[in-house]
């Protein structure tokens, strides 16, 4: 693991993999042994976790810094959505079935 303060891509991939595994395990219906991935609920849960973690950083110590942090996060999110969408379009769709639903504000 790299020193704190230096971005560790391997650690990032490890956390990403653990999160996806936890999402799949939490989504399994034991009666059918299938997992329905509910995008709205998953996205909201991950956003809440991200916000909690970001709130602990020194970069979130003032309203101006919080706004900058949120704008940087939103920009990264847009870039990742665009890249993932392009990859799915190229590959013929997502790697799993998706249940589309309206997003809620819960």
Task: Annotate each PLM feature.
Residues 1-106:
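Solvent-exposed interaction surfaces and binding hotspots enriched for charged
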